[in-house]
Each structure stands twice: as structure tokens, then as C-alpha cells.
Amino acid sequence: MIYLHKILPALASPLGLCLLLVLLGLLLNARRWVARGILILTVCALPATSNVLWRQLERGHALQDPSDAPTAEAIVVLSGMLRAVPSGDGFAYEWSEAADRYFAGVDLALAMKAPKLIFTRGAQPWSAGAPEGEVLFERARRDLVPEGMLALTPPVENTAQEAQAVAEMLSPKAKVLLVTSAFHMPRAEDLFREAGLEVTPWPVDFRASANKTTMMDFIPSAGGLSGTSTALREFLGRAYYTYLK
């Protein structure tokens, strides 16, 4: 099932749609389908397009100071901020764009906003090395978070499983500070509430740019395409859990 959840969004991504339309155009000898595919890819590769989508996804959220956070039973940091890279005879871990999730969780823990800091053992079948939460657990110890505060979920593959795993670790209707990327927060918040938890969202890792729009935002780029693809995948995820789940 996890493979299906990854493959279907890829087919519906800008690049996937472009390739399908170009292939259809070549098979039918219809240039208009090729042109449509190229047009979709071009528009989606504009930084301006990705920024509009990010703003929509992150609407209603803002960065907050840890001192302003309410107290809770647990701080929950969702996986999705590490990547394994080759290193010598094995591999090592590096931060991805979502690294703010970890640092925000640690800041809340050190501010004593909850007695427990939970990392999720997020991993995919193809992931190298230990589940992400185990790596973050050890890093938090080095960052002086008391070991007695730290906890790990069982292995999980997606946000729905993370929510269920955390709910099983806490008391019914427990209050949690939920830390994840701003664009991912609405879907995560809904899933954690469905699992029976009282959620205070703590969004980080904002992707929308506050810079003024310039002509550079209307020049297609790999970064623009990547941003648009990620944003559209999140829209698809929200639609799936809203209408199909």
C-alpha cells in the first residue's frame, strides 16, 4: 500500500502529467497534447507558481516563540527531516529542508512545555539505516534534553500511523504540542484529532517566500518545479484524507 501512496501522486505531479501528455501526443500524432504537457510543466516550474501554492497551504499559520507555547502532556515531532547519504563504507545522516521540526521540538522541551518529547520512528521500506526517530533521539540526548523526557513510537510509515501510535502512548484526549512543517500541519492536525488527541499546532519550516515578486519568479527553474510538485502532493494528501479515507 505504501508504494501505491507514493506512485499515484508521482503520476499526478507536474512532471508525471507532462510525460503522460507528451506520450499521448506522440502516440496519437497530436501536437496539441505535446504542447499542453510542455505548458503545464512550464507553468509549474515558475517560482511564482510554487509560492502561490505555499501561501495557500500555510495560510493561517505563523512562527511562534517557545515561551508563548501552552503546556501539554507531550511534544510530538513528526518525521521527515533526515536523509541518508553515502559515507565511506556506509552512510550518514544529513538534515533536509524540514530540519526546523527537530530544533523546534527541542526548544519546546528545553522550555519545559511538556514532560515528554516524542519522536516518531518514521521509515519507508526502502529507507537505509535506523528509523528517523532513533537518530533524532540520540541527537536530542547530545543536545542536553534529559533522557527521561524522550520517547519513541513504534515504526510508522505515514502521518496517520504516527497519529495512532502517539495516541496509544498517551492518556485519552491528551494535550499535545504538534510540531511539523506549516504546509503539512492542517492534515496532521486533523489526523491527530481523529486519533483522540487535543492538538496545539506548532508549525515550522515555512516554504512561502516573503520576498518581493520579481521577474526572476517568472523564469522556470528546477527549484520552482520541485516546490510546486511538493505543494500539489500535499493538496492531494488533504483531498485523500478528506474525501476518500
What kind of feature is each model-predicted range?
Residues 27-34:
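Membrane-interface helix-boundary motifs at transmembrane edges
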